[in-house]
Regions:
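Chitinase-like catalytic core of GlcNAc-active glycosidases
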Residues: 134-192, 196-258
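Short beta->alpha connector loops
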Residues: 109-114, 235-236, 254-256, 279
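N-terminal low-complexity, Pro/Thr-rich disordered segments
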Residues: 7-9, 21-81
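Hydrophobic faces of well-ordered beta-strands that scaffold small-molecule active sites
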Residues: 89, 104-108, 128-132, 191-193, ...
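Surface-exposed amphipathic alpha-helices with a cationic face
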Residues: 117-126, 184, 216-225, 263-267
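Sec-dependent bacterial lipoprotein signal peptides
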Residues: 1-21
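C-terminal active-site rim and adjoining tail of enzyme catalytic domains
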Residues: 4, 85-91, 250-259, 267, ...
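N-terminal carbohydrate-binding/catalytic regions of secreted carbohydrate-active enzymes
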Residues: 76-167
Length: 310
């Protein structure tokens, strides 16, 4: 499990820029699942990310001009998988995949699992999602040296990880292209890009909601160009702007924070919402999850094999 936090001071700065005052939230909020053990959980007081800026013509910062190289086009015969609401799933990011869960969808680590692992799941009739961190540098990944120092920000609270400067599209795009190539070449059906709401955290960079929208749309286009479907991880405030670009959603703890209704645009569009709770008992949220048609379960924070579905 990954914890995403936004300090009260950082939020006040963002709100002041918008002519607002106040700071909400008083308990630490868990965030993206990762499958590694943090050196220490973040201690900053959480709050909601700043409200997304309205859509409109976007220009890249002067230090990071938009890429001019077009994305590769998928094969005309490639059909992007469109998971429907209500599908059961397994989310295992801790180690090599265990295939014992009898569910149609598996979400597993793209680096730690092989093409043979994916093929074994396919033979059992499963669809397989490739977990990839696109918002933070990880010193334990084989491509760690591909990231220049200029894009590395503050530590994000997890051992060996630092936030990325997502404004530098021309630097990050080819790295993410290679990662998504890996997912495609291993036979994955989809991508789960992690940490796509850095703008709501103290990253060390002055990231805005508009920067995040630009980056997230680029990530979605890279996946689609490779015939992969792509899920929006958390980032609830930007769902209205991004639901058309993503094929499903992955959410952590919307029930605990009474936010699950914010995911309704995905369900209304016929797109699955894969949802997990870590501390809430099933009796406290499963009825509402069924009403909203979410694919919900309880998992332990380390995201191993154990699961308790609604």
């Amino acid at each position: 499990m990954r914890r995403r936090q936004l300090s009260c001071a950082a939020l006040l700065t963002a709100l002041a820029a918008a002519g607002l005052t106040g700071c909400s939230g008083s308990t630490e909020r868990p965030a993206d699942a990762h499958g590694t053990t943090p050196a220490a959980p973040p201690t900053a007081a959480p709050s909601r990310p700043p409200a997304p800026e309205p859509e409109g013509p976007v220009t890249s910062p002067s230090h990071s001009p938009p890429p001019t190289r077009p994305a590769a086009s998928p094969s005309p015969s490639t059909a992007v998988w469109k998971p429907r609401p209500g599908l059961s799933w397994q989310w295992q990011l801790d180690g090599k995949v265990d295939t014992s869960a009898d569910v149609p969808v598996y979400d597993i680590d793209g680096f730690e699992n092989s093409a043979a692992d994916v093929a074994r799941l396919h033979r059992a009739g499963r669809k397989v999602i490739c977990y990839v961190n696109v918002g933070a540098w990880e010193n334990f990944r084989p491509d760690r040296d591909a990231f220049p120092h200029s894009v590395l920000g503050k530590p994000n609270g997890w051992a060996g990880e630092r936030w990325l400067d997502i404004r530098q599209l021309t630097v990050l795009r080819p790295i993410m292209e290679r990662r998504f190539d890996m997912c495609r070449d291993k036979g994955f059906d989809a991508v789960e890009p992690d940490l796509v709401e850095g703008y709501g955290n103290d990253t060390g960079f002055p990231l805005t909601a508009r920067d995040q929208l630009r980056y997230n749309r680029m990530i979605a286009s890279l996946a689609h160009a490779r015939g992969l479907s792509v899920g929006l991880k958390n980032d609830l405030p930007q769902i209205p702007q991004l639901v058309a670009h993503f094929d499903f959603a992955v959410n952590e703890e919307c029930a605990q924070y009474d936010e699950c209704a914010a995911l309704s645009p995905f369900i209304a569009a016929g797109k699955a919402v894969f949802h997990v709770e870590y501390t809430e008992p099933r009796s406290g949220f499963c009825a509402e999850s069924r009403r909203l048609r979410l694919s919900s379960m309880v998992k332990k924070p380390e995201l191993g094999v154990w699961r308790s579905p609604c």
